Every structure is written in structure tokens, then in C-alpha cells.
């Protein structure tokens, strides 16, 4: 049966920004000659080496050099890396095509000492000689999970194309970053990092060429490790990759269990496990772009307290800077001593402090960060070797080249000196796609020109004239020496929302260290900055977990940073779609992620902000943030919003031990903190498109109101017992293991329905105003019994901040043989074993030797 996303209601009417692709966008290159095996297929230690050459068509040139120079000789290397992961690399024999760097600034490839034998792998690689095609088959049920049969293989220097068959109406998830339904249907997803508000279906800040499919209750996944721009077309019966460079470097994943959560473990085994946040990072955050002065920031902090709405972290946007230059202070509105004093007061009050830093550095010879960077020669270059100078908030700017040998030393000094002086607890790195407000090196020869009018302040005619001039200058600059590719205007034009590739970013002809064109490395820029910034903070304080939040990301970014979904809008569809956006990043291995609560652009309303605070309080990263052009939206401004915020944030704080335990599991295993229902219950066909509810872990179900004017919500419940979090009453008893039960739940304006799964034990605390105060209270256990009268749960405890944890406890609880069925709370007296006395309903602590969580276990709770 056809499945329709819950997300879209009049999206195009609201945003006016749905792309219209042509039939050619969706078509495959049917005239391409393809390839055939040429020579001996050789078995290797890892698997297979297959030499290919272009199929001969005599004198016919049809399908040759269509979008670039056709590469005649290519190879296929098949590597059985683990029992659940298969690596298939299709590359040019001459090894001239650009690969993602094997480094923390790209993709750290696994160092495999012993490959598995094909017979022990859960994935089978099958191929056809002429025309060459291949299949990847999951062995346990003989399901073909990737199939290129009768699909063209195109391998040109600036165009790669490969397609796989998928079932009609397949359940595909992932491929981003894009604002779209969680389940991907008939559309084109473009991967080219771009500074732009979250337009539906258009490419935005990051690039994640990874998808998961759930088919017949089992999950598998595929990653294309390629940082070039690409279109990924999902259409009926097919997924097609159209890539403008590099190689086809695929990783396929098929966990033996078939469980989507085990697929997340397998994927993050490759790209890296998500970073572990400190306690304070799990609290409520507040920010605004456009606070006029520090008095206003301090007033917001005070009014949160007066309204008794918990506030853990105060953020300051670029407003604090002098002329929006990094590492400076507005002497009038945000003087340095007041900014330092704000941090000191926050820390005294048990709160935290984060500020923004952008990568673009003002090109001004009186500005020390620019002078030092110029002396160290760390800037991205033009094709002629001069510094590339774009335009961002402070006017004409240079951009650090993260791949330059001096870049780490340069950034370390700037970051460490600044953080040490200001006393902030973390950094927010924005505009790192990288963003530029002009086309090309528009500031060449204009160092010391100072602030420039922003492009949107010009009339349309003036903007067009400026663009014409910039484009003429960019073309005149030409390609880097020896470069034969068309870097500015490749013949295959991906569906970049900005138009040409160099629009509003660093020009594709600009050069990074080693003469690498930006064309080849663009999608890695924010990812590289994330790693270097994290390492700078570790160098500053090497015992404390660093905090970095990034806008642009790539597979593996979650090891270093968290992510917010960027400049969304204060419209109901964006509230609704925030769930899908966050679920995507859970799947991408960035578990510390969230959206701007109440919306960033445009004016929110009391009802919208109230409903957004209710679900936003449970985002893995939870922050209210809005734009300087929008009206105020602090949650204390409306009575209903304040009441809903107090309830929701206090409920989150009550659950902080549960959240923290989930983040530890994410850091150790790679599981998401938020989880889509279909990933926990893959046998339930009715859940495949549900992106309006979410699970927190496996045990807490959130069913928010996401539509204007509604005071109830239709919620889907999988099999089992589901208890109301607030009343402890049994809400749903679903005896089916394949069919959901849909229930209409009352949800007045200040209420978000929350349910706990029967069979779960949730560790909790008594909520206080700050995270520190909350964690200082005794632990409680909230127990919801299943139909057998049993329940289990887990609690992870450490000091809440150490980078290298030297002492931690892992507790696993199990309650059994208790009747009648019900809902109970159990008191935990920390550090003692007598709380497990039979008086507390025969609760038993299970320390299962050899279990996965046991790896972090160092303190035996049974010891005196």
C-alpha cells in the first residue's frame, strides 16, 4: 500500500521553495556503454580485485564524455571488512581521481588487521562480467540489498553515475542534509553544503551520503564515501547517484539481527561513535541573534529565574563582537569586562556560557588574528596564489585552510587565548559551509576596506550588477595551473539551491594546501573545522569534555561536535519537520542535535512557541533561538508558554539520568538518543512514515501536538503496555506484535503526552533549577511493569564532565514476579546496596559479565 508522510500540509504554499526538477534529472544515462571485465579477477586477502575496461562500440561515441572525460580503465576492489560490513570501491586505475583524505579532517579509514572470509560475512558480493554489474546480498535471508543489474555505470572525471534497484514504495531513510520527511520518497536530494535557511527539499548545511532501508522488518544501509557535490535521486524502484567527481567508494551494512539499532552500531563502528556530552550540556539553553547589549542578556537570565523556568546555558551570538570580528568585543554594548563578568556570574549560579565564533577572518591589517594568519600563510588561495578574500559579516574576509600544516597551530592560539580570557564553556561554530556573501574573491586587492553593505541591502538591479562584475572577475581568474576540469561550471549541474557551485561560498577554483581545489573538498570544510576546534579546546583543558556546536557536518562529525539544524522558520511545518531533521542526525551519528525552538526566522506566536517548547524541551540538544528581525520569543513572555515550559523542562530534568545513560550508550555503541518508532519496531508496517512521534531511547514515547488549533493528538502505539508518564495510568494495552493501536490523546495547550513502555525502569532525579542541583538529588527509579509483571532498565553514572572517565558505574535493574500489574516508583540511595532489599518489590541488580555495557564498568556496586 502507498504510504504518505505525516509531514506535509501546504508546505509549498508556505515556503514557496520546493524545487522543480526536470525529467532528465530523474533519468539514467541509458546510452552509456558501461564496462566489462578486462583481465583476471584476482582474489585478495580482503576479497576481490576486478579490472574493468570500457565496453567497445566500434566507432560509436554515444554516451562517451557526456559530462566529463570518460575514464577507460577502472577497478573494483571488494573487501570483507567485518561480518556485517562490505567495502566496494570503484576507482580509476590511474588513481588520479580525488579521494576523501584519510585523516580526521576527512574520513579515517579503518585499520583492518584481519579481514573476514566471505563465507563468514553476512553480505555476499555477486557480479556479472559484461556489461559489468553487481549485487550485494544479505546472506541470512537471501535478500538483494543493492543491485546494479541493467543499470548504467558511468565513470568520467567530473561525472559518476550508478543506480540500484529498490522495491516500489521502498522505506528509505537518510541522505542529507535536507529539510524533508524522514521517509524519503520521489525526490532529488542534493549534497553541496550551503548557507541558506531551511528551505524544504533544498540542499543546506551538511552532506551525509548515507541511507538506511527497512524491508520486511529488517534493516540494511549504504554509505557512499565521497565529498563531491552530488544528486541522489530516490524514485519508484530505484536510487541513482549522480556525482561530480571522485570515486564510487561504497560501504554496505547488514547486521545479522536485521535490527535498525544494530545497523546504527555497525555504521558508527565505521565513521566513529558520537561524542559524550557533559551533564550541563543536557540542560536548557537560550540564545538570540540581535540582543542589543549585555544588559539585555543579563535581563533575560534574570527573567528566566523570576519565571522559574530552568535555564542552564546562556549563549551570545555575534552581537558581542566589535564590527562582527571574531575574538573581539563591542566596547560600548558588550565590553570585555562585562562579558567576562557575565561568565563569572553564570558559573557562580551553577550555569554555563557559550559564544559564537565564525571561520571567516576580517581582512584588516590592524586586526591581529588576520596579521598572524597572514604571517603563517594559512588562508585559502586563489588560482593565482593570492589570498582568496570573500565577504561575510565583518566585510571582506579570508578563510583558514584547515589542511594547511600551520592551520592547527594558528587556530589553537586564537581559540585558546580567547576562551581562556573570556571563560566560556564552549563554542558555537557557524557559517562554516563555508558561507560568503559574494561570488568569488570579491575582496581581492581590498584589504582594510572595512565593513561592506550586505548584499540584501542593495536593490535587485544593484545586486544583479554586482553579481555580473563578480562573475566576470571570477572567470578571468581562471583555473588553477594544470587543472583541465571545468571547476566553475561542470557540465552536469547538480540541483544546488544557490545555482552555480561557487554562489555564496568559496569559489570552486580556490586552492587548499597541496593545490587541492575547493571543488574537491568543499563538503569537508565544516567537518574539518569541527575537529580542529574540538582539539583546541582539549588542548586548553585536557581533562574536561569540550563543547562545540557546528552547522556544517559530514560523516564522522558526531565524534567531535553537536549540531543544530540551522535557520528554520517560525511556521508550524517547521515545528513538525524538526522531528524528522533530528531523527536524521541520530542516524548520521550526531546524537547531540536539535532545532531552534520556537523558530529562528519570522515571528512566532504564543501557541506555536508553546507547542514548540513542549517538544523542544526533549530535543537531545534543547535551545530556544531566534533572529534579530523577529520579535522576542523568550518563553516567559506568555503565560501559557511559561507554564508549558516549566512542566516540560522540569520533566526533562527529572529524566536527566535516563538521558545521560542514553548518551553514554550512544557514545559507546552508536545508538541514537532519539529513535524513530520504525527503528524500534521494524515489523510494524504502519510506522514506516511516522515522523510526528519519537521515542527517547526505547522506553519513552513523545506524542506532541504539531498542528495549529489542536487540543488532541492521534498517536500510534506499538505492541505492549504504555503508561501515562504523569498519572501512571495504563493508557494502551496493545496485544499485537505487528499492528499499531491508534489512540486520540487529550493535549490541552500546556500539555505534551508522554508515555513509558511497560517493562521499562527509568532512572530519575528530582528536578531543580540547574542541572548541577538536579544531579545532586537522590536517584529514583520509575518502574512500569509489562504484562508478565517484569521490568528492566539501566543507569550510567560518572562525574559528568571528565574527558577520560577513570571511575564509573553501570547499573542494570530487573524487577520480576510482581503482581498485580502496575506502575511503581522506587527510591535509590546512591552508593549503597541495601536499596535492593526485598522490601522494594524484589528488584534485582543484574551485572551481566561480558555484556556490552560492562566495558565501562569499573566500580562493583556490590562491594562495601
Swiss-Prot record:
Q: Which UniProt keywords apply?
A: Glycoprotein, Glycosidase, Hydrolase, Signal
Tell me the active site. 430 (nucleophile), 433, 567 (proton donor)
Carbohydrate-modified residues are 187, 364, 406, 466, 500, 568, 734
Gene Ontology molecular functions: alpha-1,4-glucosidase activity; carbohydrate binding
PROSITE patterns (alphabetical) = GLYCOSYL_HYDROL_F31_1, GLYCOSYL_HYDROL_F31_2
Q: Known catalysed reaction(s)?
A: Hydrolysis of terminal, non-reducing (1->4)-linked alpha-D-glucose residues with release of alpha-D-glucose
GO biological process entries? carbohydrate metabolic process
Its biological purpose is as follows: Hydrolyzes not only malto-oligosaccharides but also soluble starch.
Q: Which InterPro entries match?
A: Gal_mutarotase_sf_dom, Glyco_hydro_31_AS, Glyco_hydro_31_C, Glyco_hydro_31_CS, Glyco_hydro_31_N_dom, Glyco_hydro_31_TIM, Glyco_hydro_b, Glycoside_hydrolase_SF
Q: Which family does it belong to?
A: Belongs to the glycosyl hydrolase 31 family.
The UniProt entry, under Gene3D superfamilies, shows: Glycosidases (3.20.20.80), glycosyl hydrolase (family 31) (2.60.40.1760), Golgi alpha-mannosidase II (2.60.40.1180)
Q: What is the lineage of its organism?
A: Eukaryota, Fungi, Fungi incertae sedis, Mucoromycota, Mucoromycotina
Question: Known SUPFAM superfamilies for this protein?
Answer: (Trans)glycosidases, Galactose mutarotase-like, Glycosyl hydrolase domain
Q: What is this protein called?
A: Alpha-glucosidase
EC numbers on record: 3.2.1.20
Signal peptide per UniProt: 1-22
Does the keyword section mention Glycoprotein? yes
Amino acid at each position: 500500500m502507498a504510504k504518505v508522510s505525516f509531514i506535509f500540509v501546504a508546505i509549498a504554499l508556505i515556503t514557496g521553495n520546493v524545487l522543480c526538477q526536470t525529467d532528465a534529472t530523474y533519468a539514467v544515462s541509458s546510452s552509456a556503454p558501461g564496462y566489462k571485465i578486462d583481465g583476471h579477477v584476482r582474489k585478495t586477502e580482503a576479497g576481490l580485485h576486478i579490472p574493468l575496461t570500457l565496453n567497445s562500440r566500434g566507432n560509436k561515441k554515444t554516451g562517451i564524455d557526456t559530462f566529463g572525460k570518460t575514464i577507460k580503465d577502472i577497478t573494483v576492489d571488494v573487501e570483507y571488512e567485518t561480518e556485517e560490513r562490505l567495502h566496494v570501491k570503484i576507482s580509476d586505475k590511474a588513481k588520479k581521481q580525488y579521494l576523501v583524505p584519510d585523516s580526521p579532517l576527512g574520513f579515517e579509514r579503518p585499520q583492518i588487521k584481519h579481514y573476514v572470509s566471505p563465507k563468514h560475512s553476512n553480505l555476499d558480493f555477486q557480479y556479472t562480467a559484461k556489461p559489468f554489474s553487481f549485487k550485494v546480498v544479505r546472506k541470512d535471508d537471501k535478500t538483494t540489498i543493492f543491485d546494479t543489474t541493467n543499470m548504467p555505470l558511468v565513470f568520467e572525471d567530473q561525472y559518476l553515475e550508478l543506480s540500484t534497484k529498490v522495491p516500489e514504495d521502498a522505506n528509505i531513510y537518510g541522505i542529507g542534509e535536507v529539510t524533508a520527511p524522514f521517509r524519503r520518497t520521489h525526490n532529488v536530494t542534493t549534497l553541496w553544503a550551503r548557507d541558506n535557511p531551511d528551505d524544504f527539499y533544498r540542499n543546506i548545511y551538511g552532506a551525509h551520503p548515507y541511507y538506511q532501508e527497512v524491508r520486511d522488518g529488517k534493516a540494511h544501509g549504504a554509505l557512499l564515501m565521497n565529498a563531491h557535490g552530488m544528486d541522489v535521486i530516490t524514485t519508484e524502484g530505484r536510487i541513482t547517484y549522480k556525482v561530480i567527481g571522485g570515486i564510487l567508494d561504497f560501504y554496505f551494512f547488514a547486521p545479522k539481527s536485521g535490527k535498525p539499532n544494530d545497523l546504527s552500531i555497525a555504521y558508527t563502528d565505521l565513521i566513529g561513535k558520537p561524542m559524550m556530552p557533559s551533564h550541563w550540556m543536557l540542560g536548557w539553553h537560550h540564545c538570540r541573534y540581535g540582543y542589543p547589549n549585555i544588559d539585555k542578556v543579563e535581563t533575560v537570565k534574570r527573567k528566566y529565574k523570576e519565571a522559574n523556568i530552568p535555564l542552564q546555558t546562556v549563549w551570545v551570538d555575534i552581537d558581542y563582537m566589535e564590527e562582527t570580528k571574531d575574538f573581539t568585543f563591542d566596547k560600548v554594548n558588550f565590553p570585555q569586562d562585562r562579558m567576562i563578568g557575565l561568565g563569572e556570574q553564570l558559573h557562580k549560579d551553577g550555569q554555563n556560557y557559550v559564544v559564537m565564533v565564525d571561520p571567516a577572518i576580517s581582512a584588516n591589517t590592524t586586526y591581529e588574528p588576520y596579521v598572524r594568519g597572514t604571517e603563517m600563510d594559512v588562508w585559502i588561495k586563489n588560482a593565482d596564489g593570492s589570498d582568496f578574500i570573500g565577504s561575510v559579516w565583518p566585510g571582506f574576509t579570508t578563510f583558514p585552510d584547515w589542511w594547511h600544516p600551520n592551520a592547527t597551530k594558528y587556530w589553537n592560539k586564537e581559540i585558546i587565548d580567547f576562551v581562556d580570557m573570556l571563560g566560556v564553556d564552549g563554542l558555537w561554530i557557524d557559517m562554516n559551509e563555508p558561507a560568503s556573501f559574494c561570488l568569488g574573491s570579491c575582496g581581492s586587492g581590498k584589504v582594510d576596506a572595512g565593513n561592506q553593505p550586505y548584499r540584501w541591502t542593495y536593490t535587485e538591479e544593484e545586486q544583479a550588477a554586482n553579481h555580473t562584475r563578480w562573475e566576470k572577475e571570477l572567470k578571468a581568474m581562471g583555473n588553477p595551473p594544470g587543472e583541465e576540469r571545468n571547476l566553475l561550471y561542470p557540465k552536469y549541474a547538480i540541483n544546488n539551491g544557490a545555482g552555480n557551485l561557487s554562489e555564496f561560498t568559496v569559489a570552486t577554483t580556490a586552492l587548499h594546501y597541496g593545490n587541492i581545489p575547493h571543488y574537491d573538498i568543499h563538503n569537508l570544510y565544516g567537518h574539518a573545522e569541527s575537529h580542529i576546534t574540538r582539539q583546541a579546546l582539549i588542548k586548553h583543558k585536557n581533562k574536561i569534555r569540550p563543547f562545540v556546536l557546528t552547522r556544517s557536518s559530514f560523516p564522522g562529525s558526531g565524534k567531535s561536535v553537536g549540531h543544530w539544524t540551522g535557520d528554520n522558520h517560525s511556521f508550524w511545518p517547521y515545528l513538525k519537520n524538526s522531528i524528522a531533521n533530528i531523527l536524521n542526525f541520530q542516524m548520521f551519528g550526531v546524537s547531540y542535535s536539535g532545532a531552534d525552538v520556537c523558530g529562528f526566522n519570522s515571528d512566532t506566536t504564543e501557541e506555536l512557541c508553546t507547542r514548540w517548547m513542549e517538544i523542544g524541551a526533549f530535543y537531545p540538544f534543547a535551545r530556544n533561538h531566534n533572529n534579530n528581525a523577529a520579535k522576542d520569543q523568550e518563553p516567559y513572555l506568555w503565560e501559557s508558554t511559561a507554564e508549558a515550559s516549566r512542566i516540560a523542562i522540569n520533566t526533562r530534568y527529572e529524566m536527566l539520568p535516563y538521558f545521560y545513560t542514553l548518551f553514554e550508550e550512544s557514545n559507546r555503541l552508536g545508538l541514537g538518543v532519539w529513535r524513530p518508532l520504525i527503528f524500534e519496531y521494524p515489523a510494524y508496517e504502519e510506522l514506516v512514515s511516522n515522523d510526528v512521534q519519537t521515542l527517547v531511547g526505547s522506553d519513552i514515547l513523545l506524542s506532541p501536538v504539531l498542528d495549529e488549533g489542536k487540543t488532541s493528538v492521534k498517536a500510534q502505539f506499538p505492541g505492549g503496555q504504555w503508561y501515562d508518564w504523569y498519572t501512571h495510568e495504563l493508557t494502551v494495552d496493545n496485544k499485537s506484535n505487528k499492528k499499531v493501536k491508534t489512540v486520540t490523546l487529550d493535549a490541552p495547550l500546556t500539555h505534551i503526552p508522554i508515555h513509558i513502555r511497560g517493562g521499562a525502569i527509568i532512572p530519575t532525579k528530582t528536578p531543580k533549577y540547574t542541572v548541577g542541583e538536579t544531579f545532586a538529588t537522590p536517584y529514583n527509579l520509575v518502574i512500569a511493569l509489562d504484562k508478565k509483571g517484569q521490568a528492566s532498565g539501566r543507569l550510567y553514572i560518572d562525574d559528568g564532565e571528565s574527558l577520560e572517565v577513570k571511575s564509573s558505574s553501570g547499573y542494570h535493574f530487573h524487577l520480576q514476579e510482581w503482581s498485580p500489574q502496575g506502575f511503581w516508583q522506587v527510591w535509590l540511595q546512591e552508593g549503597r546496596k541495601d536499596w535492593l532489599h526485598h522490601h522494594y518489590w524484589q528488584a534485582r541488580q543484574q551485572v551481566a559479565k561480558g555484556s556490552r555495557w560492562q566495558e565501562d564498568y569499573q566500580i562493583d556496586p556490590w562491594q562495601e
